[in-house]
Amino acid sequence: MAGGGVVVVSGRGLSTGDYRGGLTVYVVMVAFMAACGGLLLGYDNGVTGGVVSLEAFEKKFFPDVWAKKQEVHEDSPYCTYDNAKLQLFVSSLFLAGLVSCLFASWITRNWGRKVTMGIGGAFFVAGGLVNAFAQDMAMLIVGRVLLGFGVGLGSQVVPQYLSEVAPFSHRGMLNIGYQLFVTIGILIAGLVNYAVRDWENGWRLSLGPAAAPGAILFLGSLVLPESPNFLVEKGKTEKGREVLQKLCGTSEVDAEFADIVAAVEIARPITMRQSWASLFTRRYMPQLLTSFVIQFFQQFTGINAIIFYVPVLFSSLGSANSAALLNTVVVGAVNVGSTLIAVMFSDKFGRRFLLIEGGIQCCLAMLTTGVVLAIEFAKYGTDPLPKAVASGILAVICIFISGFAWSWGPMGWLIPSEIFTLETRPAGTAVAVVGNFLFSFVIGQAFVSMLCAMEYGVFLFFAGWLVIMVLCAIFLLPETKGVPIERVQALYARHWFWNRVMGPAAAEVIAEDEKRVAAASAIIKEEELSKAMK
């Protein structure tokens, strides 16, 4: 959905009027079903750390870790889970996801958003079933790779699809539905792990349900409408108008449809190869850098270190296995509740405000965690921490989770999905997902080794990065709240810093935007004149 009305160009940026359509029951249902794709990523992220701490799973696949846990702590308790095979199990999914999302951009542009979602769902079903029946480490990794292919495809296409079907005034709310379902998936995984913690083959019941969100996405792709943008791009103009009218709940979509058609006319002659080539020109460099860097920042908040390894972390600090798994459920519940706040307020307060506030909150929480662990382990050495201290650390981690869940979590997916023009969107969103999976792989592969080597310092490491993130959000990120997707590039062209990065292309973008503003204004005036004459 184009999202936006007449744009009034001012000296400082863009403001928007209203298109005729608004939030309808139909568009909410469509967004809800597509956002279920977030369950794929969420369930897998949530189940990974918990299943690793299940006794039967450890004995079968990671006997070295199990043996180390049974020994008296003579070395640092931070090193209990420092195991190469365990790190490969966690991070292999993200390596596969990185590969699949490179192909996802081609599939999305040529076969459509629906087909891409269907293929991603099918991969996830296959991966969940393979893991549920895994007999050895090799089979486990194959299942993880299949899951990675599914997550890569889903993560690339679902945010893009949501941005294209959502009305601009509610784009943030509906797009964050994806992140909300990621958090719901994490919570469900925590509940499943806790429920099966004492079962001999409970780990199979933890890994197997991963097929369920894949099935939901696959079946949903059969009934969801294709996005108007893709239909127009493929020459199905009238069908695109019909879908847009249904999404908007009104037949008066001329201005919005004109925006979509104009954007498609620019993008149509551009091949996928040209789309990738265009992305690396100065004209599109601001969006490219924003998209990639925000993925780096999202992962270097330390979020996946927490989500992957919450049970592992608390086990390392001396908590009993059941208590460690229960802590995961608590963290998951806080995650869901805080993401709901982002759903309600992202279109009210804007992206930058949430990133800045959330970044400061996360930084203080990481700093507190590092300092408390340094002080307490100096007191207790390799002995388990007292329950009161562990509970305090859990509370601080929940503060971190809440800050992330209404800021860098949802904005890390929302912002890249709304800043690219149609001709660069497939390649641009692919770059965002590649960045996300690349840095998720790095964190998944390295965190337990970092924890072993840096001890409490690993939390101070993430706190330092959070300071940098907040400063970048303050000075370098344009506010995209309420700005139509097709005109976000003009927002960058008028930004004090990105204007210089774009060079002469900035003036070209501003001139093109002014022409489109005039055209959209003329269409609306015609409509008003026609109504007045009736």
Swiss-Prot record:
What Gene3D superfamilies does the database record attribute to this sequence?
MFS general substrate transporter like domains (1.20.1250.20)
Show the Pfam families listed in the entry: Sugar_tr
Tell me where it resides.
Membrane
Check the record and name the InterPro entries matching this protein: MFS_dom (IPR020846), MFS_STP/MST-like_plant (IPR044778), MFS_sugar_transport-like (IPR005828), MFS_trans_sf (IPR036259), STP/PLT_plant (IPR045262), Sugar/inositol_transpt (IPR003663), Sugar_transporter_CS (IPR005829)
**One term of GO molecular function:** symporter activity
Expression triggers = By glucose.
Residue ranges in the Cytoplasmic topological domain are 1-21, 109-114, 166-173, 226-299, 350-352, 409-433, 478-534
Main subcellular location of this protein, as a coarse class: membrane
Sorted alphabetically, which CDD domains does this protein's record hold? MFS_STP
Q: How does it sit in the membrane?
A: Multi-pass membrane protein
Extracellular compartment segments:
43-87, 136-144, 195-204, 323-328, 374-387, 455-456
Kindly state which keywords UniProt assigns to this record, in alphabetical order.
Answer: Membrane, Sugar transport, Symport, Transmembrane, Transmembrane helix, Transport
What PROSITE patterns does the annotation carry? MFS, SUGAR_TRANSPORT_1, SUGAR_TRANSPORT_2
Instruction: Say which family it is in.
Output: Belongs to the major facilitator superfamily. Sugar transporter (TC 2.A.1.1) family.
Q: What does this protein do?
A: Active uptake of hexoses.
Return the protein name. Answer: H(+)/hexose cotransporter 1
- Source organism: Parachlorella kessleri (Green alga)
What does UniProt list as this organism's lineage? Eukaryota, Viridiplantae, Chlorophyta, core chlorophytes, Trebouxiophyceae
The protein's gene is named HUP1
